[in-house]
Amino acid sequence: MKLIYTEMSYSMTEILVNEARKAADQGYRVFYIAPNSLSFEKEREVLTLLPERGTFSIIVTRFVQMSRYFTVESSPSKQHLDDTTLAMIFYRALMQLKPEDLPSYGRLQNNSVFIEQLVELYKELKNAQLSVHDLTGLDHPQKQEDLIKIIELAETIMIQQDYNQDSPLQSFARAIKLGLLNNQLSKTVVVIDGFSRFSAEEDYLLSLLNNNCQEVIIGSYVSQKAYQKSFIKGNIYEASLHFLQDLAQKYHIKPVFATSNQVFKPAFSRLTQLFEATHDFSQVDWQLQKNDLDHFSLWQCHHQKEEIEHVAKSIRQKLYEGYRYKDILVLLGDMDAYQLQIGPIFDKFEIPYYLGKAEPMAAHPLVQFIESLERSQRYNWRREDILNMLKSGLFGCFDDSDIDRFEEYTQFADIKGFTKFSKPFTINSSRQYPLDFLNEMRQDIVLPLQELFKSQKQLGASLVDKLILFLKKIRLAENMQGLAQSQLEVEKNEEVWKRFTDILTSFHHIFGQEKLRLSDCLALIKTGMKSAQYRVVPATLDVVTIKSYDLVQPHSKPFVYAIGLTQSHFPKQIHHSGLLSDQERARINEIRNYRHFDIASAENSKKNHQTALSLFNAATKELVLSVPTVINETFDDLSPYLKELINFGLPLLDKGKNYLSYDNSDIGNYKALLSQIIAINRQDLIEMSDQDKMFWTVVLRYLRKQLRKQQLELPTSDYRLSTKPLSKEVIEVCFPKGIPLKLSATALTVFYNNQYNYFLKYVLNLNKTESIHPDSRIHGQYLHRVFERLMKDHTQEPFDNKLKQAIYHTNQESFFQQVYQDNAEAEYSLAILEDIVRSTAPILQLNQNIKVIDQEKNFHLDMGNEILVHGIIDRIDQLSDGSLGVVDYKSSANQFDIGTFYNGLSPQLVTYLAALKQIAPHDINQLFGAMYLHLQDPKLDLVTFKQIDNTLVESIYKALTYKGIFSEVEKEHLSTGAYQTKNALYSNDELETLLNYNKYLYLKAVKHIKKGHFLINPYTSDGKTVQGDQLKAITRFEADLDMAQARRLVTLPAKEKKECFLTLMRKESHL
């Protein structure tokens, strides 16, 4: 064995490549070994240093891959054991044990996290060269007993299923020990680069290679100053020194110092010496030179997004200077925090990149499909799971529009559970859903699922066969091929599909002869899919490499950007979590020689120093170290290592916000420039954060309150929300000439409430999501129907019998049966409605002097060539003198207010009067009024009554009265009925004024509507608060900011209010 060390200013790779070349020139086969995380970059670096740029004599690889070169022909043809397969084996082993067999872990048998921990422990035991029987000295002896039972049973299953329990390194070591590879190894030289420690498995293999290979050469970075130190605790080279010293002591060899021809920039060497002096308690009498600072930059940004954008702009600048993407390395302090953000930002700046991390499959549509399938079976056809299956794009041949239509209907009809999905869809609504098409789609969905889900407990092999048949029926493979939109997505889908088929194969192999329920089968496949990962190799080498900073090696790239270096992540504090604590691992390690667990927490200090040293020397030209103030929405401090650099004289540059400018870095890229233009256009919207906007909004409210106290006014802000008029072509289509515009009293109210709301409802025809569950609209229909039946019954039956019959027959109608007999909640609503009917009906019994002329009367009121008003009158009554009136049933309290009517917000009763006047017989000229009847179950506060007597009954009937507009001429006839006429009597001239002004409101609205320009103008009654529909989610209307756009209602003092409004009406309607 040969041990080599060198200073950070030299290239250890060049030194080791020269050693490898010498051995190759002598005819030896050379294996150049690098850590798993660095083998790809190391191979490129080694081949670059070779004069011939390539050779068959030097193989750059990893320990595991090296073993395959020697054992590929002699390896037994056994099944491969990966993490997913291991998890399934442990699951099968736990299935065969009873909870009482495992005192410590019996309750965790079906826990997926526990199974994952078992897999990790088993792999650790293999790497540590330990067996489960070596787990002595645990905190609780029962833990070892349980683990022995589980792992031994799992190993028995592995033997039965012909799985290879040995790792590749164990197989390699066994072959060496048996002498099967002596001839090959005698002609082999092993060069090891980039290691600062070996696992027990690697350590054992190394001892065998040292005894059988021609030579083993190991290199590491250690300064001569550190090598000569007797006390190395806390030294930045502590990890490498321990590494070399342990090897030197074990193999009785002295490390030698070497240098390379390539010497890196002195600035990095001087920074390293300062860093070393800080940690070995020595002093230097010099500082960094001014030109040294050109090679280092310390950035501080507010948050991650700004930090990544600054890096992207700097990379674009480097390209402008002539460098290439492959010259740049980006290191992340926290992979999870940056992984989701860095991709879109680099895409915006058109920077190709390769993220050196395996991607989890959890977000792939195939995994979402499998998860939805499993949940559909477990939760009995829950609607959300069925829809998620369809939306994955992997189920059947359905367009997105078909899935949207199916989703809309299932939400409307509340389809959930197997019972409802299995029955034909029969319920429809005013939207007239295409039930024939939806039922065909339902069958295409239900039949294959039903065939699969009816599977009983059976052999795993049979379940897999049925699952595969199901996947063929729904064309999963064909749909999977259609998902990809680019070559990269094709490659990703191929990797995911390969992992999926491997999982199915493993399941078939392990559980083929075991009886399982379908739910267990799907759960196991889902767990395997969610925990699986895949990796895609970049299509070109000219990309920016992105990886975690703790995987970096010295002198990696000319330009290195390390971001996210906060105190929480640099240095990293690794704490092991698993079935064994670090204390238990340490006790086991004290007993065993050459076989040991890796205890990450014990290595934190020296490993972090080694990582920081490698990071500070990662670049050969320029190193940028960046830290955000806020990471993952949490404030964080500077890393202690960065604070040391600041003490060395490196300035901390506050990059601040990404201010828009005309610099080359801002406008030098097309896609980035487009993004900047959009940002400039919206600059007034993004100048403040949401928190800042909230603060200043509250401040503005407070300021206005104080100004009002001092009788001062704050100028109202200008209009910020504007709408565009419709084009002439759209106006011609929506409002064709010669055809009157159809309006209703409700539509007119919506228009005067907020013009934009009218545009959404009656021009775009946008509707809220419907539901079969009864709402206020359906409740109103029910009450209307009961009273319609009741008033049509002219038999001599007692009134109570008539009421019972009306309720009974209404309840028997198919629509109301579907609505109110669907569940207990709907039945409870029906019971409340019946109580309301019984409470309100007596008012009809009391008014025996009226005659019901008509009910549910449709009308079309002609107001000229441009408008046609339509609607339905609930009831037309006739008094004993022949005069007619209109009754409108309401499920909530309503009362006619002349001010509200004047402002266009309550035209219903006057519109019904106008319609009644038009449709009334010619011999009837008198109208007695239009009124609301509040259908209610009156609530009384008994505390206000001294005793229960007639006053209580009178109060109930007082609440059940007609309220509205009444003719003064019919005052005598109305006094005997339940009519509230106080402040509600109008003369015939005044009624005529109301009718004329009502027509004026309609004509005014039609004129504005046909212009095609709808304002965002919800009404305000006091100029301080907005009562109209603001539609905030669509219009972004804010009362404090947009009060100038609100329509101010005309309000008058209560005294002579009626006369004043009538005067205004006559004036405006030109009467």
Curated annotation (Swiss-Prot):
<dbReference type="GO" id="GO:0004386">
    <property type="term" value="F:helicase activity"/>
</dbReference>
<keyword id="KW-0238">DNA-binding</keyword>
<keyword id="KW-0269">Exonuclease</keyword>
<keyword id="KW-0347">Helicase</keyword>
<dbReference type="GO" id="GO:0008409">
    <property type="term" value="F:5'-3' exonuclease activity"/>
</dbReference>
<comment type="function">
    <text>The heterodimer acts as both an ATP-dependent DNA helicase and an ATP-dependent, dual-direction single-stranded exonuclease. Recognizes the chi site generating a DNA molecule suitable for the initiation of homologous recombination. This subunit has 5' -&gt; 3' nuclease activity but not helicase activity.</text>
</comment>
<comment type="similarity">
    <text>Belongs to the helicase family. AddB/RexB type 2 subfamily.</text>
</comment>
<keyword id="KW-0234">DNA repair</keyword>
<dbReference type="InterPro" id="IPR049035">
    <property type="entry name" value="ADDB_N"/>
</dbReference>
<keyword id="KW-0378">Hydrolase</keyword>
<keyword id="KW-0547">Nucleotide-binding</keyword>
<dbReference type="GO" id="GO:0016817">
    <property type="term" value="F:hydrolase activity, acting on acid anhydrides"/>
</dbReference>
<dbReference type="InterPro" id="IPR027417">
    <property type="entry name" value="P-loop_NTPase"/>
</dbReference>
<dbReference type="GO" id="GO:0000724">
    <property type="term" value="P:double-strand break repair via homologous recombination"/>
</dbReference>
<keyword id="KW-0540">Nuclease</keyword>
<dbReference type="Pfam" id="PF12705">
    <property type="entry name" value="PDDEXK_1"/>
</dbReference>
<protein>
    <recommendedName>
        <fullName>ATP-dependent helicase/deoxyribonuclease subunit B</fullName>
        <ecNumber>3.1.-.-</ecNumber>
    </recommendedName>
</protein>
<dbReference type="InterPro" id="IPR038726">
    <property type="entry name" value="PDDEXK_AddAB-type"/>
</dbReference>
<dbReference type="InterPro" id="IPR014141">
    <property type="entry name" value="DNA_helicase_suRexB"/>
</dbReference>
<keyword id="KW-0227">DNA damage</keyword>
<dbReference type="Pfam" id="PF21445">
    <property type="entry name" value="ADDB_N"/>
</dbReference>
<keyword id="KW-0067">ATP-binding</keyword>
<dbReference type="GO" id="GO:0003690">
    <property type="term" value="F:double-stranded DNA binding"/>
</dbReference>
<dbReference type="GO" id="GO:0005524">
    <property type="term" value="F:ATP binding"/>
</dbReference>
<dbReference type="InterPro" id="IPR011335">
    <property type="entry name" value="Restrct_endonuc-II-like"/>
</dbReference>
<dbReference type="InterPro" id="IPR011604">
    <property type="entry name" value="PDDEXK-like_dom_sf"/>
</dbReference>
<comment type="subunit">
    <text>Heterodimer of AddA and RexB.</text>
</comment>
